[in-house]
Amino acid sequence: MAIDENKQKALAAALGQIEKQFGKGSIMRLGEDRSMDVETISTGSLSLDIALGAGGLPMGRVVEIYGPESSGKTTLTLQVIASAQREGKTCAFIDAEHALDPVYARKLGVDIDNLLCSQPDTGEQALEICDALARSGAVDVIVVDSVAALTPKAEIEGEIGDSHMGLAARMMSQAMRKLAGNLKQSNTLLIFINQIRMKIGVMFGNPETTTGGNALKFYASVRLDIRRIGAVKDGDNVIGSETRVKVVKNKIAAPFKQAEFQILYGEGINFFGELVDLGVKEKLIEKAGAWYSYNGEKIGQGKANAISWLKENPAAAKEIEKKVRELLLNNEDSKPDFVVDAADAEETNPDF
């Protein structure tokens, strides 16, 4: 429907005034002069990239990864950093827990010589560093480990036993309002690792909650719930963890998908194991008995030998990965893999 000529003139004058006052690009029509596709970074897990629907975690957004202790939260973020560095991106790690192991990070493929690292004294300092890095436009990925360790300055300077009700939640709420715009403008991905706490007196429903108030839940474009669901064994020796990640919130694709993969101790996510499983599932890799074949050529007897072949033939592995992504990404299947928990779906005040 055509807009009245006088209204068009008034709109053009208003747009011109806004651009003159706030700069070019401060207002635009949604479909013009911008890519509608969200740029993403791989998580290091093929099945999780597919569950996210866009091929990875979105740039310019806030992501929250939470779960119990030793569930693989830090490992997953280090794999994201390794993926970003392989693409030539600059990454920073805000180590509020003072627990980052550089030897382990290097084993996961992180270039620790080019990884920016900060161990802030207070929560305010950590969030100000995040904001400064985002505003610089020179850092592509920032990881904060963890929200629970972002202690307000007043709490650190006070006595043990003093009451500091709502301080951390207020600090996070203020920081998220400030960070959201800067992250979008600089196209910086900000990942918060978070811990789980139990609500007291919950008789029905899930008593679990995350720390730092509700602001992060609102501002996060993606929320991932990561859990250890079993052990990976070689004989009697435990060599890794079976891990399940649920996409609890997703603003870039259909939510409520889940992915399962292995995290091997000292190696990280078992990417090639996922590649074999998904390749067989999508009939890209043929499996007859214990033998695996690709393009009519036998690649190994048993899954371990098939994985070894893929590691030795990166071109074939890349080809299979590309085909799997083309088959499974951006399909129209929006059917959820799990039922969302009422605690995750409820709307509450974002300031606390």
UniProtKB/Swiss-Prot annotation:
Keywords: ATP-binding, Cytoplasm, DNA damage, DNA recombination, DNA repair, DNA-binding, Nucleotide-binding, SOS response. Signal peptide: none annotated. GO terms for biological process: DNA recombination; DNA repair; SOS response. It comes from the Bacteria. The keyword Cell division does not apply. It holds the Pfam family RecA. Its main location: cytoplasm. SMART domains: AAA. One of its GO terms (cellular component) is cytosol. NCBIfam families: tigrfam_recA. This is Protein RecA. The gene is recA.
